[in-house]
């Protein structure tokens, strides 16, 4: 069985505990796979997956989450189902932060991803076109432009996550998940959280719940 | 005497306590003005000003601020000189936050402006193309995409300013200065802070300090 989480940039795959990613244009038919399940926030990439695996099944219509949130993306739903309790941060092109309590989704928010901060600043002024310094000191006021931009992006993201997690367990996934996790004690970094939510949905389908 | 603060988007003018702004392409020769002083972070717009006021004098070489910060923009320098003590937030296309203590600059940071958050999120995914909700509730977890985006931008900006100001006085200027000031008790909104710093520089020049 092959699982695929189709994001804004990459297609993320999961098979027997292994996780990898591909750009849509680099996607090639892999081994013969009997079952392929996917979720997608990117229709062109989903069409690309279906060219390669025409029998792939979209899990979105089967995914149910207890929430008052209107229009929650299917990837965030899967991440929430994947943790059941705590705060899940999916740090990719965008950073989503969602709070779960006893399998109930309490709400969440969206920030630009780290790379987006860079490109956003660049578009304001060429003077702000700097590679972010990922090692910037967050406890002292910056003393140059590159650090000022890095601090303004990274500290903002870190403080927003801190503010949302209080005493809850904190889970990180996505391309910048590992980097962000190191700002927090006891944070869990796990690139299979979304897939765990997809597997849970499959179990629920088999149990006839959905 | 006419003062001009040339930003990334607008030219901001000051004359006899009045403040107004113009887009560079809409700039027309005004009344006869004997003295014109300017600062600029935008060379094409500065050239445009000099077409209209060929005798305008750049204050940048005369502006001195006690700081360890390398490469501080001349507009931030002027804002710092304009407050002397406290935290000054200039909220335009970019948001700059600078901390002053007894006329000494302790450092500062840069975040994308509110409009930049919007356009950045739009560029990540069409699903994130929403006008920000400037009245979003910052004390409860968002329950829809538009609020999730607004909360992720506005709360991040507000928390970063809060974190930097501690017990210091807080000054706001720039296009979104008035909006942001309302999140803080006793914040001062003043669209002439940068001009006050320019006037201070002129005084110093006359006193022969520079």
UniProtKB/Swiss-Prot annotation, chains A, B:
ATP binds at residues 5-12, 93. It comes from Wolinella succinogenes (strain ATCC 29543 / DSM 1740 / CCUG 13145 / JCM 31913 / LMG 7466 / NCTC 11488 / FDC 602W). Pfam families: Pan_kinase. Catalyzes the phosphorylation of pantothenate (Pan), the first step in CoA biosynthesis. It is found in: Cytoplasm. Substrate binds at residues 69, 73-76, 145. Gene3D superfamilies: 3.30.420.40. Keywords: ATP-binding, Coenzyme A biosynthesis, Cytoplasm, Kinase, Metal-binding, Nucleotide-binding, Potassium, Transferase. K(+) binds at residue 90. This is Type III pantothenate kinase. InterPro entries: ATPase_NBD, Type_III_PanK. One of its GO terms (cellular component) is cytoplasm. One of its GO terms (molecular function) is ATP binding. Its cofactor is NH4(+); K(+). Belongs to the type III pantothenate kinase family. GO terms for biological process: coenzyme A biosynthetic process. A monovalent cation. Ammonium or potassium. Pathway: Cofactor biosynthesis; coenzyme A biosynthesis; CoA from (R)-pantothenate: step 1/5. It catalyses: (R)-pantothenate + ATP = (R)-4'-phosphopantothenate + ADP + H(+).
